[in-house]
Amino acid sequence: MNQVADILKLAIKAKQQGIDAVLATVVRTEGSAYRRAGAMMLICEDGRSVGMISGGCLEPHIIKRAFWLTRNGANVQVYQTGDDIQYADDGQAQAGVKRTKSDIYDRSDNGLDDDSNSGLDEADFDELNFGLGCNGRVHVLFERLTTATPLLETIRNVRRTQQPITVATLIRANDYQHQGSVSQNRDNLQIGMRINLDEYRSLGSVSALGKTAFSSILANTVEELAEYKLSDKNAEYVTVENGKVTTEWLVQRLQPQLRLLICGAGNDVMPLVTMAKLQDWHVTVVDSRSQYATRMRFPQADVVMSIPLDDRETLLKLSNNAAVALMSHSLSQDRARLAILLEHPDNYRYLGQLGPRYRTERLINEISMNLSNPTMLEAGIHKLHYPIGYKLGGDGPEALALGIMAEINAVMHNQDAPVSGSHNNVSDI
């Protein structure tokens, strides 16, 4: 499932067909949650839907209620994923005091009256409790397609330009002067409003407006948010206090697709392309043999091309900030590609060589013999994963692809996988 790609495609179709839709976005999680902040789901009024914001537990309710929840505009709902019987806290649990219905289902910033839940019956409240045993809370922003379009267009532009953008989404605004949560107050703080923090403009604006374009409260808030730097996360929940107004934001670093460059166009590359595309990666397949590098053989790949072995410029361009898998089954091809890549270890994020360890060591020795200063390859060799992939068991191209994808995922997401730590744990294929 290409979650983001499928959402973008369906949004375009719905707009062209004049069909309304609701975008549901996870804006905050507490405790255990299946999806992280930023996960999205698009629900069309004709019944079509794509994307997931949970493991399938919340989706039936969300599909059922999406249009009802957004009848008065964007709003945030909070879903409990604890046990069937929920308690307010540990002390009350011991005393046998259960949560009330209002504790189990939190309305938030939707501009609705206090009795707005009157349309929900007992069965609905039982459903909203979601006795899943995960002991978490999932905050979900609901908005109609017209409101969400600027965000979807921004995501599409990020994927096209390969340039990340930092966006802040307002998920709550408490105006203490007016005693309560508001969906729109005198400073035009609208739930679901989004700001491009890189350019100081609201999403959907044609040009950068600068700090002075915002109201006094919002201008100070935007300035504080712009100084907020995401560390190792792509999304963060941020609270900003500004005078009598407290705002809560989801700050996201919208990233381009992860990119995979596969050098080699053999049959064993096909399942690797499929697995990468299932995760919505951008996949390029190259080979110097034009009869192998064809669109007919790799219809799922984003780019398929034949490039000469001595085309250094194209190889470095395609491998920039990407994961690279050398899988040609050809000594001459692997030697040529590896020689170029080992000299530029800072150009890519991952480099793996297919084949047994002794084969790769032979390639490295042959490359080193042609250099006046072989030590220049040390950084590249240190970064090289060989043999490529984790040894997970199984046999055949699919098992190989699974091990390769697992290792690349771990490296690209800076995770220490349980089987990592030594080249001896990878498969000698």
Where are these regions (language model features)?
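Segments forming oxygen-rich coordination pockets for charged ligands
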Residues: M1-S288, M296-A301, N321-A323, E407-V411, ...
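Alpha-helical elements of the RecA-like P-loop NTPase motor core of helicases
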Residues: P60, M270, R335-A336, E361
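Conserved Rossmann-like nucleotide-cofactor binding loop
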Residues: D268, Q291, R359
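Short amphipathic alpha-helical segments
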Residues: V273-M275, R297-F298, K317, A336-I340, ...
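Conserved SAM-binding strand-loop segment of SAM-dependent methyltransferases
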Residues: D302-P308
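Short amphipathic alpha-helix with an adjacent loop that forms part of the alpha/beta core around
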Residues: D310-S319
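Adenosine-phosphate binding glycine-rich loop
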Residues: Q353-I429
